[in-house]
Every structure is written in structure tokens, then in C-alpha cells.
């Protein structure tokens, strides 16, 4: 049987698979999200060999699980939340003890100020991993993570976060609908 050729994921491009409007809203669909995860996994693969991928709940669990699957590594999660918009993040559920002595990759969907990532890193480092690095799907601000798939200052609408149930009906999140209306979309 011939060897399987290596898979080379294309660099994510907004024009082909995601929609970046001239008004600054990036609507991410599932194919574009998959492309971002493949590109991010390749970056990690070439520079770091984690034993464990740790997703930050809620939204970081999704790219974290996909990247762990692509890299064929163990996956775990921790939860960090903000009680209200603009509030400082707090750890709701810390990382599992199995990070101790292992090479860990902490994954979130976006990173702007780094408040959430710094809190996650402190919680992970308290458990004495062998090494720890960070990755995000979207770098949206000044905080420098170790790996990111795409850098943007656009408002991001993710495919799993786009719709919610209101009065028994699935509808676009009202805040997203308002953002799109305000931007003429």
C-alpha cells in the first residue's frame, strides 16, 4: 500500500470561506471554522508537541476538541466566565489534575486583552505542567498568544453561537441581528 501523502491545509482566507463585510463583521461558517482549525493544528504540530489540549469553556472547547482530534491528543476542559459584559473573568471549573507533568496547549476561540488566557495560564501553572503554550482561532487584540489562526479586529459571529432558542423558536441571537442591522447587512 502506498504511503499516505501529507495533508496540507490551505491558509484560511476570508474571501473564499468566511464572510468579512466592509463594515467589519466576520460571519464564520462551519467550513471556514474547519479550515481555521486545520491551519491552527498544523502551526501547533510544527512548533510544539502537546500531550494534552485544554479548551476554555464555553467557546474554546469547540476549537480545542477539534484541534485535539486532529493532533490525536488527549482533550480536557476548564471553565472561565464573566458574570456580565466587561466584568473580570473568574475560574468556574479549574483545569484537571492530569495537566501535572504534561505538555499542555490551552485553547480559546478569541483573545483580546488576554484576561481570560492569563487566568487560565495561572490555573494551569499552579498544577505544574511540564510546559504550556496557548492557541486561539482569532487573535482580536494586543495579547500575544503562542499560536493563532487568524488576526482580525472585526466583530465575529461563530457558527455555534449564531442562533438561540427564544419562545420555543430558533432565531438569530438578537445582539448579533442588531449588530448586522447596524452595519447595514
Describe the predicted segments one by one.
Residues 1-185:
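PRPP-associated nucleotide enzymes
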Amino acid at each position: 500500500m502506498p504511503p499516505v501523502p501529507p495533508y496540507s491545509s490551505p491558509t484560511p482566507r476570508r474571501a473564499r470561506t468566511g464572510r468579512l463585510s466592509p463594515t467589519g463583521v466576520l460571519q464564520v461558517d462551519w467550513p471556514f471554522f474547519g479550515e481555521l482549525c486545520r491551519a491552527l493544528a498544523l502551526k501547533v504540530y510544527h512548533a510544539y508537541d502537546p500531550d494534552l489540549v485544554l479548551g476554555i469553556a464555553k467557546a474554546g472547547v469547540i476549537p480545542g476538541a477539534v484541534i485535539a482530534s486532529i493532533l490525536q491528543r488527549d482533550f480536557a476542559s476548564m471553565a472561565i466566565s464573566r458574570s456580565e459584559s466587561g466584568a473580570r473573568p473568574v475560574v468556574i471549573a479549574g483545569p484537571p489534575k492530569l495537566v501535572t507533568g504534561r505538555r499542555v496547549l490551552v485553547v480559546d476561540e478569541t483573545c483580546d486583552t488576554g484576561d481570560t488566557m492569563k487566568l487560565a495560564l495561572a490555573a494551569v501553572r499552579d498544577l505544574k505542567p511540564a510546559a504550556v503554550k496557548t492557541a486561539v482561532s482569532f487573535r482580536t487584540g494586543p495579547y500575544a498568544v503562542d499560536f493563532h489562526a487568524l488576526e482580525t479586529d472585526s466583530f465575529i459571529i461563530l457558527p455555534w453561537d449564531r442562533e438561540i432558542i427564544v419562545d420555543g423558536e430558533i432565531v438569530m441571537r438578537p445582539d448579533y441581528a442588531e449588530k448586522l442591522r447596524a452595519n447595514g447587512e
